[in-house]
């Protein structure tokens, strides 16, 4: 079981924090004014670009998951030190799982955003994917936490509060269609993987549904990049796209290693 320091808030699931390093050299920023993520998730890609280039670009981060957007809005205006302080608990003070569950319920009773952060950031989930509708809360055990604000969390808060960062909660197609006709736009697609069973994703964001109308996307003016797992289904769909390169990716929880392909449209 985990012990020691657990950094709450801004935990990049799936090694997203480091993944940008693996594909950033494939992305060209010539004449680009706007960075768009239709599936922003934790917005780590836009964040890493911002860390490197600052407010040189506008950043449009979009996700249909309302919890994520609430999380961003909460994170923008919260004193992180005070917030994290209230969750620093010593497991030894709670000698049964019942007591920890009661504590969890007290935290979550009024604050949906707190509930999301606690479930995602303060609990040990093993290899289970977190379900949106939690019925048996005892599945998720709160362990000893000695959390503290780290430099990435403070920097991410600065990113969210930049006047060049715009947050939206729309369907990915609506987001994409708004920006597809301008060659000053760089659109980075990092959608849920085809074989993902993570029910946190909306139904229309899972499976091959998300890759509809790809031939049209391939011909639009905006520069579009897809970061996708190397599987036969996506290779067939993207056979007319430019392949810029590949890189290995190891998932932090399962230690499963896969190959990812960076695709770019023919614009």
Model-derived segments and spans:
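SAM-dependent nucleic-acid methyltransferase catalytic core
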Residues: 2-22, 80-188, 192-198
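Short helix-loop-beta connector
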Residues: 28-34, 181-183
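SAM cofactor-binding core of SAM-dependent methyltransferases
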Residues: 33-100
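Active-site flanking residues adjacent to catalytic metal/cofactor-binding acidic residues
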Residues: 36, 62, 170, 189, ...
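Short, polar loop motifs at secondary-structure junctions
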Residues: 41-42, 151-155, 228-233
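Short catalytic/ligand-binding loop motif for oxyanion handling, primarily in non-cytosolic enzymes
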Residues: 44-47, 68-70, 125-128, 195-198, ...
